[in-house]
Amino acid sequence: MISVNDFRTGLTIVVDGQLYRVLDFQHVKPGKGAAFVRSKLRNLRNGSVNDKTFRAGEKVEKAQIDNRKMQYLYAQGDEHVFMDLESYEQTELASSAIEYELKFLKENMEVHIQSYQGEMLGVELPNTVQLEVTETEPGIKGDTASGGTKPATLETGLIVQVPFFVNQGDVLIINTEEGSYVSRA
């Protein structure tokens, strides 16, 4: 058990039998009445984000999340196959469980798979990934002076806004949290 006073961003807890990750929290001490903790929680099973208020000092169960390093192998219909790098055991995850992460996954990429009591929860991506541009308008000389952007389709199907000097075939570094262009690789 952990006190809500000890909340921190990224902490995984169990509330009412549901598994949540703390996205944001704020300790509130009103002038009148008891202190409380206002929090924003993401349900790890269905992805919904909920606001929940706890009384100061209230205890919640801390969840033990297992992180295993795995390699993304391939997609088979609606399932995606990952291989444990230590035991070579293969695990399948449904597309619906990793819908956002699929925009950044490419074959043979190493990721961390999160599980709770044997139940696979999802994929933890690295902060940045390198993806190749498969389609974009060609850059025209002199375009960089205006500092504008254009859409580019990457090898995973993700569409990001990139500077005019980026061309088809370039490898880009993409921020996985925001889904945005960082730089050329």
UniProtKB/Swiss-Prot annotation:
GO cellular component: cytoplasm
Gene Ontology molecular-function annotations: translation elongation factor activity
GO biological process, one term: peptide biosynthetic process
Compartments where located: Cytoplasm
Pathway: Protein biosynthesis; polypeptide chain elongation
Keyword entries, A-Z: Cytoplasm, Elongation factor, Protein biosynthesis
Keyword Cytoplasm part of the UniProt annotation: yes
PANTHER family reported in the protein's UniProt record: ELONGATION FACTOR P, ELONGATION FACTOR P (EF-P) FAMILY PROTEIN
Purpose: Involved in peptide bond synthesis. Stimulates efficient translation and peptide-bond synthesis on native or reconstituted 70S ribosomes in vitro. Probably functions indirectly by altering the affinity of the ribosome for aminoacyl-tRNA, thus increasing their reactivity as acceptors for peptidyl transferase.
Full protein name: Elongation factor P
Organism, scientific name: Lysinibacillus sphaericus (strain C3-41)
Gene name for this UniProt entry: efp
